[in-house]
Amino acid sequence: MVDRVALPGSGGWIPRVRERAHENMRRHESCTQSILASFMEELGIRDPWVIRSAGALHGGLVSSYTCGVHIAGAMVLGLLMGREELEQGSDGLFPVVFPAQELMGRLTRKLGSHSCRELTGVDFTDLNQAIRYLASSEREKCLERVADGAEEIGLFLKELEERGELFRVGGAKSS
């Protein structure tokens, strides 16, 4: 069974997600959680376990690897298009694979890299570097990357919906 995923009807949801992600990052840190929480709020998804699951994904997987904006994009796609049950096997995975690959490319082009270390110049495994970065004006660039990334994810979701490609394969227990 294929289930279409519906996005908010009003056109103002993407700017709201962008602004909320920026504000979340400014006030609470964690690029991944800031974006994820913004989309969850806008889409009416209330599950603290999802936010908790992203707890160690900021700062490039807390190791300056993959940018948290990219990780958040993959998580948002997974929330909307991912399989509900492992038993769905590959059939449940396929709907999200190509969109996720496309989104990763778009985010990399938008931000200039997929690497947290390349974007920030910080090794987040070095606590002194991390503290200096968080207290510096360079941190402002991450706030903008979070906002830009959230907007790009929203635009991408809207395009998928317009192309009829925003769907998930329902599991045996799906409604």
Regions found by a protein language model. Give the residues of each.
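Polybasic, low-complexity association/targeting segments
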Residues: 1-25
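Phosphate-handling active-site elements
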Residues: 42-52, 79-99
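Active-site flanking loop/helix segments enriched in acidic
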Residues: 16-27, 36-42, 130-134
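A short glycine/serine-rich beta->alpha loop
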Residues: 19-26, 56-65, 134-138
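DPxDG-like acidic metal-binding loop motif
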Residues: 72-80
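C-terminal binding/interaction regions
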Residues: 96-175
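Short cysteine clusters
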Residues: 31, 67, 116
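Acidic-glycine-rich active-site phosphate/pyrophosphate-binding loop
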Residues: 6-11, 38-55, 122-127
